[in-house]
């Protein structure tokens, strides 16, 4: 059974049906899914996006806001989401620590890898916010980077679909689920698992990536116990 895992949630997933902001019902659901992992003896880290609040690329689309500033705005959005997830985890009795790549001492700790590992060893959930701390990098890349740094055995990308498909299953009825694919296939066949930087970094560090449906209760724990029928895996 996998011991240490990093779970990546998109910011959009927190928004629920409204499409923006934070749905506390989804926060509660995420917290309960993470608690199941912790209760099973696993060490859990989280990275969350910020798309429910603002996306850097979109903010900079018309040229008024520079891309670098737009990306920093997106990083701040991930901190907001990180605080929300921390509150939800603590509400159900878990210990959680927020570490930000952008210093915000009043809100969370600075990102320090040794401290993050120590938190995990003590059974605390660590939420990594602020992306990588640099513009032009996605939160998917941040998730792969942090997972590599904490020496996670698995990176789970929790999405709205149950895996990776050869084309968009929401648009094409004949879309085929790909249960297993290599890093090279993900890169060369333009299959949208994560961006190329994320995939390349995962390949370099031999970090398996699992893509699954975050809205199915019990999915995360079942996958961590070895049920790969619920997901797609890139390795």
Curated annotation (Swiss-Prot):
Keywords: Allosteric enzyme, ATP-binding, Cytoplasm, Kinase, Nucleotide-binding, Pyrimidine biosynthesis, Transferase. It catalyses: UMP + ATP = UDP + ADP. It is found in: Cytoplasm. Pfam families: AA_kinase. One of its GO terms (biological process) is 'de novo' CTP biosynthetic process. It comes from Sulfurovum sp. (strain NBC37-1). This is Uridylate kinase. Catalyzes the reversible phosphorylation of UMP to UDP. ATP binds at residues 8-11, 51, 55, 159, 165, 168. Pathway: Pyrimidine metabolism; CTP biosynthesis via de novo pathway; UDP from UMP (UMPK route): step 1/1. Allosterically activated by GTP. Inhibited by UTP. UMP binds at residues 50, 71, 132-139. GO terms for molecular function: ATP binding; UMP kinase activity. Homohexamer. The keyword DNA damage does not apply. Gene3D superfamilies: Acetylglutamate kinase-like. Its EC number is 2.7.4.22. GO terms for cellular component: cytosol. InterPro entries: AceGlu_kinase-like_sf, Asp/Glu/Uridylate_kinase, Uridylate_kinase, Uridylate_kinase_bac. Belongs to the UMP kinase family. Residues 16-21 are annotated as: Involved in allosteric activation by GTP. The keyword Transferase applies.
């Amino acid at each position: 059974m996998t011991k240490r895992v990093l779970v990546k949630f998109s910011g959009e997933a927190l928004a629920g049906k409204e499409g923006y902001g934070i749905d506390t019902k989804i926060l509660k659901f995420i917290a309960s899914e993470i608690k199941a992992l912790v209760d099973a003896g696993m060490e859990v880290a989280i990275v969350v996006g910020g798309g429910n609040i603002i996306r850097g690329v979109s903010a900079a689309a018309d040229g008024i806001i520079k891309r670098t500033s737009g990306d920093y705005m997106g990083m701040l959005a991930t901190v907001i989401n990180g605080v929300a997830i921390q509150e939800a985890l603590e509400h159900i009795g878990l210990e959680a620590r927020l570490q930000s790549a952008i210093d915000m001492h009043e809100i969370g700790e600075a990102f320090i890898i040794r401290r993050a590992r120590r938190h995990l060893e003590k059974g605390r959930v660590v939420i990594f916010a602020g992306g990588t701390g640099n513009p032009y990098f996605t939160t998917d890349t941040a998730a792969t980077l942090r997972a590599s740094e904490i020496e996670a055995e698995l990176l789970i990308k929790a999405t709205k679909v149950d895996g990776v498909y050869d084309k968009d299953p929401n648009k094409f009825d004949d879309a085929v689920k790909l249960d297993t694919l290599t890093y090279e296939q993900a890169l060369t066949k333009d299959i949208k698992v994560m961006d190329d930087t994320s995939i390349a970094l995962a390949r370099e560090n031999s970090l398996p990536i699992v893509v699954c449906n975050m809205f199915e209760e019990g999915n995360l724990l079942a996958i961590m116990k070895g049920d790969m029928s619920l997901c797609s895996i890139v390795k």
